[in-house]
Amino acid sequence: MSSYFVNPTFPGSLPSGQDSFLGQLPLYPAGYDALRPFPASYGASSLPDKTYTSPCFYQQSNSVLACNRASYEYGASCFYSDKDLSGASPSGNNKQRGPGDYLHFSPEQQYKPDGSVQGKALHEEGTDRKYTSPVYPWMQRMNSCAGAVYGSHGRRGRQTYTRYQTLELEKEFHFNRYLTRRRRIEIANALCLTERQIKIWFQNRRMKWKKENKLINSTQASGEDSEAKAGE
């Protein structure tokens, strides 16, 4: 059994009388791994309490410490912006990156939703729905200068007139019970109505006027008859 360090409990010479060769063995041969420690159960350690490390281990440990220290010592000024990342050309990224060339995000920043991006997406979605939504006939405005848009089927709704429109139509009917096409167009443009609506209103107004005149004439005729009978 050979050992890499001297054990004082083990005799310095063999029973066969040969010379002591344990002291001639090198403590650290060429195949010794400096990174792997040996347990203390092999014997009392007479070597000084010193750690032998290789230069490559120093370089590796420094880079590891730099990475760990950089993740805690970075402030707000060390973060890269999106413009810096997007402006960098891909051809210029051939050099090896250091530990500080990468972005560092906290878990809250990684999983936190971006309110501005979501608000912009919702706004664009709302505008798309606004222009692509179908317009049904019942959604159109009936009192419009361009005319009411009705469906190809179904019953047309009854037109309602404002007090101003009714007053102006009554004035026109008082002077002219029948309108020419030119005058009808002028009134339609002035009252924000269609020619058809003006035409229908005058037709209904003439029917009402005829009924009123017939009722007046009938009452006058009945009154004259009663007076004639009373005179006899």
Curated annotation (Swiss-Prot):
Main localization category: nucleus
Key words of the record: Developmental protein, DNA-binding, Homeobox, Nucleus, Transcription, Transcription regulation
Record-annotated DNA-binding residue ranges: 154-213
Listed Pfam families: Homeodomain
Location in the cell: Nucleus
Record PROSITE patterns: ANTENNAPEDIA, HOMEOBOX_1, HOMEOBOX_2
Residue numbers spanned by region Disordered: 88-126
GO cellular component, one term: nuclear speck
Short sequence motif Antp-type hexapeptide: positions: 135-140
InterPro entries assigned to the protein according to its UniProt record, in alphabetical order: Antp_homeobox, HD, HD_metazoa, Homeobox_antennapedia, Homeobox_Antennapedia_CS, Homeobox_CS, Homeodomain-like_sf
Similarity comment: family membership: Belongs to the Antp homeobox family.
PANTHER family: HOMEOBOX PROTEIN HOX, HOMEOBOX PROTEIN HOX-A6
Protein name: Homeobox protein Hox-A6
Natural source organism: Mus musculus
Lineage: Eukaryota, Metazoa, Chordata, Craniata, Vertebrata
Gene (UniProt): Hoxa6
